[in-house]
Amino acid sequence: MKILQLGKFYPVLGGVEKVMFDLTVGLSETGLSEEGFSEVGLSEVGLSEVGLSEVGLSKEGLSEAGLSEEGVECDMMCAGSDGRGTEVIRLNPHGRILCHRTLIEAAKTTIAPSMVTRLRRIAKDYDIIHIHHPDPMAAMALRLSGYKGKVVLHWHSDILSQKALLRFYLPIQNWLIKRADTIVGTTPVYLAESPYLQGVQEKCRCIPIGIEPVISDSAREQEIRNEYSGRRIIFSLGRLVEYKGYRYLIEAAKYLDDSFMILIGGGGPLRESLQREIDELGVGSRVKLLGKVPQEDLASYYGACELFCMSSVMKTEAFGIVQIEAMSAGRPVVATKIPESGVSWVNEDGVSGINVAPRDSKAIAKAILTITDNEATWKKFSAGAAKRFAENFTKEKMISKCLNIYAETLSLH
């Protein structure tokens, strides 16, 4: 089976690109002894009677599934970021990145014409093209490619902030939804609530985002704890932008005592205004803006905190990968119940943490106090967070679910 992941960017800049990259690497590394099709997926393509190991296909079933003995070949086609030119990057024997020079980048959209010409040339080589939305350049390239094979549309989010762009893009988006054989979303909530997917629910499937667990450096973790004199650390991480709702997390500090320390990692355009808010509220002893946290320190901040807080207020926050990073470290989560967003599905209320109404600083503080009130309660939520991660959000589970959906898609006529 040969797959093409189609989208943006490389090098990876954000969550959508990270999912596409991780799928490319994970799928191209899939062999017979690793994650493969489940029995459900195999039966969809008529393979229930061939030899089947517990986690993959036997050699006898390969030809019927259209697979080589080596497993899955998976390439990733994208526009380049950071001035990257057109090049082919070999990831492993079965995976490549086909990177194309970006001529123009505006409104979070790239113009990379060489994607169109290359895709027209090579599209026929792939059994499935897995396109990641929103990305007008990728959609245009697919539209002009003449590709006749199966299409999986990965619906990461609706286009929410670029309204002018959407007016021009909507005809292509509508074509893409109709053209797709299968539509994938990261949560069942977002799939069910998106106004653009209401007429195609029968071909929607869910693949939650999966990641490698974060592993804290114990020495660095202790340094962070010592830096704040053993106070109870509440950690949050993300760009300092309006939809993250950080001012409500800052306001929540008014309802906490000095045994707590809220650390907010990340940079962005609202840094100065958020710092003014901290100063005006008089909570500087309980809230600190860390700025951009070095990648090598992130896991240790998760390890040093008692819980993670996601205060986002808009549907722009569709999933919240930082939540599952915290869960992988066994840290409970306080998140918000954003209408039509999957955030509160990711954080299972009462199990991995507590979900509260958006824009409610008192509710955020109350949830923090509830989880940290006593050791037994914290341990219950900590265990629940670790269990929810292991059962739903590992990279292995994401790859396995994706393979099953490919099998189902290939069986469609």
Describe every region a protein language model picked out.
Residues 131-138:
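Short His-centered aromatic/hydrophobic patch
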Residues 303-318, 331:
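Acidic donor-binding loop of glycosyltransferase active sites
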Residues 273-293:
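Nucleotide-activated donor-binding/catalytic signature segment of Leloir-type glycosyltransferases, i.e.
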Residues 123, 177, 292-293, 300-305:
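Short alpha-helical donor nucleotide-sugar binding micro-motif in glycosyltransferases
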